C-alpha cells in the first residue's frame, strides 16, 4: 500500500514539475520575443548605411527667406525626452519642456543613422510593456528575466560599434582620396541687412512702458573700500553691460537715498580667484538707472555694471543669494574698487617737439611714424605689437560681419566691449577679467583673433553653432542679458543659424514677453541630451529681417575651439536617455 501511495505522489510531483517547466519555458519565450521585438524595431529604425561625413551641415534660414519669404519648417520634431524633465524643472526656459513624441517617420531619413527615432522605439517598448502586464508577475517579472537589461545594453552598444566602424572607414576613404585637401569649411552666409530697430532689445521694452528713470552715475575712487549690498550672479559681467532683473522692491527701497541710483555689488562664484588669493570673490559694481512695478509684488530694475571689485570672504555679513532667484535676505560686505591701468602706445610717449602736430594729419601720419621709428632704439615689430590702433583695426575687421557699429573709443571701455562681442573661452574670460592692465587685456584679446570657435552644449558637449555666425540684434552687441517673467536672467547670444540636427523643439511658440518685439520665441533643446539651450525667434510682423534667428543661452552653452568639433559627441547621452526611457516606461 505504501509503495502505491509513494508512486502516486511521485507521479503528481512529476506532472507539477512538467507544468512549471512548461510555464517557465512559455514565460522565457515571451521575454525572448519581447526583446526580439525591440531588436527588430531597433534594426528597422537604424539601417546599416555609411555615417554622414564629419563636415559642417547647417540650416540656413536666410536662404529660405530669399526663395519666397516662407518661414523654415521645424528641423526636428521627435526630441529625445529625458524622464527627469518636467514642467517647472527648467525655470530658465520660460515654458514647460514637455513635448509629445512624434509619430511621423518622414524625417527619419534626415537623421544621422546612429540616432534613435523615438517613435519606433516607443512603439516597441509599449508593445512589450502591454504584453508583460497581462502575464503573471507583470513588469517585475520582465525586468527580473535573464539578462534583460544586459541584452538591451548589448543591442545599443553593438549599434555604436557599427557606427564607429563605418565612421572610421568613411574617414579613411576620404583621407585616401584627398590627402592634401583642408578640412571642410562652413558655407558662407549671404549678405543681409538687419531690418529691425536694435534699440528695442537694448531698452528691454518687454518690461513695459511704465519704467521711470533713476538719475545718478557714480564712479567710485580706485582703491577705495565701500560697504554695500551684494548679490551673486551665474554669468560674468564686464563693466558697461546692462543687467535687467526683477526682485522684491523691499530689498532696495530702504537703501536708495532720495533720487540717487543705488550702487550694489554683483559677484561671480564661477570666476575662480588666483591661487594666491583663494578667499576672494570678484565682481562688479552695478547702478540702477530705471525701475518700474511689475504688478505681481515684484519690481523691474535696469542696472549697468560700472567697475570691477574684489571682496574678501571674511568681510561678508550674511548669506549672499543669487540675484536671479528672487533673493529674500540682504547681504552686505566691504568691497574694494580695482584699478584700470593703461599705458599709451610707445611712439606716442616719444616727445617730438613741434613735429608732434603732424601726428594728427592723415596724409602725414605714415611718414611721421616712420620718422619716429628711425629715432628710437625699439624695432618696428615691437612698436606694432603694442599698437592700440592696430588692435582696434583688426577687431573692427573681425566684427564687420556682425553689423556692430557701437565700438567705443575709450581703451578701457573697448577692452571690456571686445570681451563681450568676440566670445572668448571661459579660461580667457577669467584672465581678461582678473588683469588690472588694459594693455595686457588687449593683448590677450588679440591672441584670439585667429581662433575659430564654436558653441558647445554645456551638458553633453555636442556642437550647436559657429561663433562666426554671431550677429547683433541689439545695439549693445551680440551678447546681451535678458530677464524672463519668472525673474531668471539669461545671457543670450544671437546667431543666424545652428548646426543641422543639433536642436529640437519644445512646447509651442509664443509672442508673450518677447525680448525682440515683432518676433515669436520657441524653446529649443539639444538634440542629444534634451536640455534647454536657447530659443528660436521667428518674425510675425512683415518687413523684419532676418526672418529667423536663434538665441543661445549662456548658462547652457560654452565656447570651445573648432578643433574640438565632432558630429558624434552626444552618442553617450543618446544611449543613457534611451535606457532611462525604457526603465521609466516599465515602472
UniProtKB/Swiss-Prot annotation:
Compartment(s) where it occurs, according to its Swiss-Prot or TrEMBL record: Nucleus
Acidic residues compositional bias, start-end: 75-85, 170-181
Region annotated Disordered, chain positions: 1-113, 158-195
Any Gene Ontology biological process: positive regulation of neuromuscular synaptic transmission
UniProt PTM comment: Ubiquitinated.
Biased composition (Basic and acidic residues): 159-168
Pfam families per UniProt: Yippee-Mis18
Signal sequence, start to end: none
Keyword ATP-binding (UniProt): no
Keywords from the named record: Metal-binding, Nucleus, Ubl conjugation, Ubl conjugation pathway, Zinc
Biased composition (Pro residues): 182-191
Domain Lon N-terminal: 227-453
One annotated Gene Ontology cellular component of this protein: nucleus
Gene3D superfamilies named among the record's database cross-references: 1.20.58.1480, Peptide methionine sulfoxide reductase
GO molecular function: metal ion binding
Subunit structure: Likely a component of a DCX (DDB1-CUL4-X-box) protein ligase complex. May interact with pic/DDB1.
Function: Substrate recognition component of a DCX (DDB1-CUL4-X-box) E3 protein ligase complex that mediates the ubiquitination and subsequent proteasomal degradation of target proteins. Has an essential role in mediating growth by negatively regulating insulin signaling. It also has a role in maintaining presynaptic function in the neuromuscular junction synapses of third-instar larvae.
Family indicated by similarity: Belongs to the CRBN family.
Name of this protein: Protein cereblon
Native source species: Drosophila sechellia
Gene name as annotated: ohgt
Amino acid at each position: 500500500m505504501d509503495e502505491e501511495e509513494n508512486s502516486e505522489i511521485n507521479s503528481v510531483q512529476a506532472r507539477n514539475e512538467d507544468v512549471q517547466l512548461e510555464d517557465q519555458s512559455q514565460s522565457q519565450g515571451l521575454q525572448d520575443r519581447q526583446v526580439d521585438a525591440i531588436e527588430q524595431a531597433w534594426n528597422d529604425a537604424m539601417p546599416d548605411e555609411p555615417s554622414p561625413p564629419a563636415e559642417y551641415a547647417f540650416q540656413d534660414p536666410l536662404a529660405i527667406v530669399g526663395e519666397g519669404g516662407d518661414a523654415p519648417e521645424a528641423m526636428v520634431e521627435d526630441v529625445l525626452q529625458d524622464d527627469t524633465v518636467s514642467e517647472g524643472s527648467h525655470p530658465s526656459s520660460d515654458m514647460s519642456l514637455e513635448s509629445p513624441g512624434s509619430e511621423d517617420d518622414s524625417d527619419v531619413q534626415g537623421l544621422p543613422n546612429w540616432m534613435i527615432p523615438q517613435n519606433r522605439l516607443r512603439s516597441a517598448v509599449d508593445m512589450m510593456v502591454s504584453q508583460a502586464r497581462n502575464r503573471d508577475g507583470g513588469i517585475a517579472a520582465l525586468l527580473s528575466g535573464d539578462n534583460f537589461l544586459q541584452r538591451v545594453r548589448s543591442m545599443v552598444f553593438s549599434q555604436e560599434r557599427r557606427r564607429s566602424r563605418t565612421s572610421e572607414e568613411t574617414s579613411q576613404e576620404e583621407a585616401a582620396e584627398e590627402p592634401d585637401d583642408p578640412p571642410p569649411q562652413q558655407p558662407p552666409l549671404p549678405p543681409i541687412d538687419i531690418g529691425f530697430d536694435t534699440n528695442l532689445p537694448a531698452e528691454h521694452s518687454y518690461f513695459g512702458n511704465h519704467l521711470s528713470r533713476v538719475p545718478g552715475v557714480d564712479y567710485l575712487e580706485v582703491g577705495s573700500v565701500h560697504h554695500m549690498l551684494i548679490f551673486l550672479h551665474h554669468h560674468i559681467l564686464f563693466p558697461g553691460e546692462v543687467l535687467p532683473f526683477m526682485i522684491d522692491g523691499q530689498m532696495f527701497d530702504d537703501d536708495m537715498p532720495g533720487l540717487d541710483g543705488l550702487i550694489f555689488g554683483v559677484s561671480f562664484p564661477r570666476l575662480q580667484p588666483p591661487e594666491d588669493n583663494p578667499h576672494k570673490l570678484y565682481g562688479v559694481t552695478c547702478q540702477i538707472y530705471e525701475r518700474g512695478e511689475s504688478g505681481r509684488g515684484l519690481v523691474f530694475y535696469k542696472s549697468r555694471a560700472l567697475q570691477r571689485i574684489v571682496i574678501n570672504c571674511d568681510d561678508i555679513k550674511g548669506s549672499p543669494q543669487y540675484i536671479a532667484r528672487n533673493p529674500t535676505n540682504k547681504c552686505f560686505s566691504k568691497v574694494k574698487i580695482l584699478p584700470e591701468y593703461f599705458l599709451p602706445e610707445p611712439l606716442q610717449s616719444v616727445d617730438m617737439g613741434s613735429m608732434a602736430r603732424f601726428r594728427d594729419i592723415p596724409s602725414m601720419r605714415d611718414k611721421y611714424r616712420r620718422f619716429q621709428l628711425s629715432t628710437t632704439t625699439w624695432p618696428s615689430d615691437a612698436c606694432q605689437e603694442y599698437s592700440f590702433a592696430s588692435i582696434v583695426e583688426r577687431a573692427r575687421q573681425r566684427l564687420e560681419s556682425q553689423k556692430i557699429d557701437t565700438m567705443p573709443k575709450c581703451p578701457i571701455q573697448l577692452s571690456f566691449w571686445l570681451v563681450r562681442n568676440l566670445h572668448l573661452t571661459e579660461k580667457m574670460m577669467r584672465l581678461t577679467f582678473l588683469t588690472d592692465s588694459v594693455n595686457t587685456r588687449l593683448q590677450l584679446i588679440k591672441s584670439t583673433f585667429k581662433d575659430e570657435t564654436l558653441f558647445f552644449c554645456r551638458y553633453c558637449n555636442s556642437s550647436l553653432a559657429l561663433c562666426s555666425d554671431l550677429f547683433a540684434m541689439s545695439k549693445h552687441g551680440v551678447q546681451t542679458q535678458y530677464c524672463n517673467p519668472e525673474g531668471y536672467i539669461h545671457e543670450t547670444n544671437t546667431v543666424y543659424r545652428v548646426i543641422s540636427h543639433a536642436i529640437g523643439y519644445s512646447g509651442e511658440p509664443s509672442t508673450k514677453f518677447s525680448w525682440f518685439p515683432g518676433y515669436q520665441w520657441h524653446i529649443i533643446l539639444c538634440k542629444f541630451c534634451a536640455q534647454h539651450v536657447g530659443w528660436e525667434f521667428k518674425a510675425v510682423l512683415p518687413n523684419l529681417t532676418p526672418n529667423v534667428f536663434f538665441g543661445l543661452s549662456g548658462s547652457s552653452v560654452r565656447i570651445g575651439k573648432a578643433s574640438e568639433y565632432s558630429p558624434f559627441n552626444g552618442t553617450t547621452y543618446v544611449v543613457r536617455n534611451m535606457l532611462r526611457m525604457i526603465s521609466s516606461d516599465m515602472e
